Amino acid sequence: MHDTILKSKVFLDHIAIESTNPKKIAEFYSKNLMMKKKCVSNIEWHCFGPNRLLIFKKGINNKLSCAAFGCKSERKLNKIRKRVLSEKIKIKEYSSIYLEKSSFSIYDPDNNKIVFGVPLKRWSKKNKYHAPLQHLTLQSLNVKKIIDFYHKKLGFAISDRVINENGVITTCFFRSNKEHHSLACFKAKNVGIDHHSYEVGKWKLIRDWCDYISKRGLTLFWGPGRHGPGNNLFVFFEDCDGNKIELSAELELIKNRKFLDWPHDARTLNLWGKSYLRV
């Protein structure tokens, strides 16, 4: 029962982010990440592409409205629900046009809303720029309490940790399937979203994506580089609200290994060069 999430092969299905101008940010993703946009109401826009779905709601810029994790059967979802209830975590039924009616939501120690459900079938036609939404990274004042919640209570597996010279965990990477992480958390001065990431597959596709967004006037603020934990290649850029977006390639696939501890230094975050340290 300890690795309930991992054994259920959970994946990040979609995220919802608040914005003072949902229409504007939806137009950004439609133009620059080749996602179709849909106006749901005057305060909510949806963007979707092959295996990537984002929801933008009227609110405070850069605030996570929710992160929705999917699994492929009601049986697996029921196991997760049972695990959550056994930990005495309060559950609320969750309604979404993208998930089966059995979906539910909970809140983590930083008051981030986390949803679990079985995704309904939707458009997933691949093209040259296939880039599924792959992981969400959070910021927290206290990474340990995030570990206690997601690992000990929910059953995400730990892939890697980053520890500073005082023995404090500054970063933790959680996996819910064979991919190195579908969720991570950095120790920071703020609480909320750090970044979200799309897995493009191969290194040459990062090149193609960078050429594509460059033609639209965007510039990278970090990368190209290679992370230590996960060993993936990456680039980062920002959307019109300042949300950080990662394009990743060749993320480590883990069959069965114990987590590794990495030092809190620049080379851990980028084996190739300059780093982006949160604290």
Locate the predicted segments by residue.
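A short linear hydrophobic-aromatic micro-motif
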Residues: 53-55, 90-93, 159-160, 182-184, ...
